[in-house]
């Protein structure tokens, strides 16, 4: 059914495969606007097919309207395929870049917190550091909240990207790797084939 927020609006996550040509995003945004649906998050990028792009939307709106948006998107000529993955078993991530004030006194603590959260420091200046945070929304929100005490100068977030989990992945059920990571699997497969 999707998330229903405190304000009564519903939130759905949609993934669309669309033709990679000018005006497609504008047509899709217009469709959302006409139906009174807010695009809370949007990520667009090249897909595995050269002439197609993949879009991930997080749409917010009236529950009766937002629940049907995938059907309306599917009617657009440029949309090859659309899926509502709100209730599906998916892996999703978001990326944020956050510039935080970091004086000589506060810098060690800022870096310590970044390490605890497995956050990358991608730029260091005289009075600030820029962090790259990848994860779910809760992780990013938590890190930004923690950094507020030092002074958050700028935040830039991507939209959510999502992909259906693989069925019956090694070491777990429905795409969960368990203790065996992808690099371990590649190393083991390389040893078995003699290519490592």
Residue ranges of each PLM-predicted region?
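Long, contiguous binding/interaction regions
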Residues: 1-54, 58-196
């Amino acid at each position: 059914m999707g998330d229903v927020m405190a304000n009564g609006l519903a939130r759905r996550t949609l993934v669309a495969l669309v033709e990679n040509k000018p005006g497609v995003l504008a047509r899709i945004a217009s469709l959302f606007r006409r139906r009174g649906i807010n695009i809370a998050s949007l990520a667009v990028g090249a897909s595995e097919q050269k002439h197609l792009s993949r879009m991930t939307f997080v749409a917010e709106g009236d529950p009766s309207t937002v629940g049907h948006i995938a059907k309306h998107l599917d009617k657009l000529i440029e949309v090859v395929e659309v899926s509502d993955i709100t209730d599906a078993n998916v892996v999703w991530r978001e990326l944020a870049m956050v510039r935080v004030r970091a004086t000589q006194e506060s810098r060690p603590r800022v870096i310590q917190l970044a390490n605890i959260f497995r956050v990358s420091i991608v730029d260091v200046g005289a009075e600030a550091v820029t962090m790259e945070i990848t994860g779910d929304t809760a992780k990013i929100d938590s890190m930004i909240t923690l950094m507020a005490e030092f002074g958050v100068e700028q935040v830039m977030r991507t939209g959510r990207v999502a992909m259906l989990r693989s069925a019956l992945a090694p070491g777990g059920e429905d795409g969960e790797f368990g203790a065996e990571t992808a690099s371990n699997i590649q190393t083991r497969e390389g040893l078995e084939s003699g290519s490592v």
